[in-house]
């Protein structure tokens, strides 16, 4: 019986590496792929950060694939990523909203490119290291939370279509993170099994989105400078550093002392004001 070919999305981290190990043990033929999405050299953080967009991670993914015995390709999609994910990310902040770039990436970039690459490389399926499962009901597929609820990633995948799900494998869906680390250790990857996890946005490995906006938006400081904090009656409470520096629900880091906790409940780009209230919602 001919082996099914799987396009394995490799990040160089423990999850995609263990996912690849499991698929190989199940008899699949793997083709690895890592997409170069963003060049952090422009932000001066390549040397100090090891985010999934770094050159280090690209070559770590290739090294893991080679050690496990399957071919691996690095594909450059930086322009597409910038035009879609980064443009949306910047645009949402400038409209006073907080973006979720992972959802945008999964729906418009990642799965689309994976399916496209899988077709080009004659792969039957694609696989990732997400902690998620796929269920079946009434002839349709649906996303299920991963067995490890603390690592469940279905929220970022809610936009996947029936076609996407029909071609997707989630080898880690039934496992906990502890079990994944143990598998890596048992396969001789002790260092990988102890590797920490990144919680940052992949193209902002230092988690400083404010500096990122200032670097990416022309004349940012002049266009999005200081404005006013106001209360629900319109009374001025103090000055802020520019509305894109704040998010709905934010309480800490406002830079003003009001004698009681205050939350950002609305952001108005049109007049550069941030509305504050004593609870996260005026209905509370």
How should each PLM-predicted stretch be described?
Residues 1-158, 169, 177-180, 185, ...:
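ATP-dependent adenylation/nucleotidyltransferase module used to activate substrates
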Residues 135-140, 231-233, 268-271:
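Short acidic-glycine loop/turn motifs at beta-strand connectors
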Residues 151-152, 209-214, 283:
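Short, charged/polar, Gly/Pro-enriched secondary-structure boundary elements
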Residues 162-232, 238-240:
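Contiguous mid-protein beta-loop-alpha structural module that forms a pocket-lining wall or clamp
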Residues 228-232, 236-250, 255, 267:
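Oxyanion-binding "anion nests"
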Residues 272-276:
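A generic structural motif
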Residues 277-284:
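Conserved small/polar residues in nucleotide/adenosyl-binding loops
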């Amino acid at each position: 019986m001919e082996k099914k070919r799987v396009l394995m999305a490799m990040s160089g981290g423990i999850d995609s590496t263990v996912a690849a190990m499991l698929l190989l043990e199940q008899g699949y033929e793997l083709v690895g792929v890592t997409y170069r999405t963003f060049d952090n050299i422009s932000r001066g953080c390549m040397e100090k950060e090891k985010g999934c967009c770094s050159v280090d991670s690209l070559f770590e993914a290739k090294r893991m694939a080679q050690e496990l015995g399957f071919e691996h390709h690095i594909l450059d999609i930086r322009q597409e990523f910038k035009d879609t994910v980064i443009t949306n990310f910047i645009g949402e902040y400038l409209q006073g909203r907080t973006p979720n770039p992972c959802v945008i990436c999964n729906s418009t970039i990642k799965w689309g490119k994976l399916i496209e690459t899988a077709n080009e490389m004659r792969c039957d399926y694609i696989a990732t290291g997400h902690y998620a499962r796929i269920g079946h009901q009434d002839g349709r597929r649906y996303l299920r939370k991963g067995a490890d609820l603390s690592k469940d990633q279905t929220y970022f995948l809610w936009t996947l279509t029936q076609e996407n799900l029909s071609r997707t494998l989630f080898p880690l869906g039934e496992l906990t993170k502890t079990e994944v680390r143990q598998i890596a250790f048992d396969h001789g990857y002790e260092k990988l099994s102890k590797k920490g996890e990144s919680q940052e946005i992949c193209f902002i490995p230092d988690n400083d989105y404010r500096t990122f906006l200032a670097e990416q938006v022309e004349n940012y400081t002049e266009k999005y400078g200081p404005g006013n904090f106001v209360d629900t009656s319109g009374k001025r409470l103090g000055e802020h550093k520019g509305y894109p520096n704040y998010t709905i629900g934010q309480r800490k880091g406002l830079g003003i002392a009001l004698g009681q906790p205050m939350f950002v409940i609305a952001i108005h780009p049109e007049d550069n004001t941030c509305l504050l209230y004593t609870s996260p919602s005026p209905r509370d």
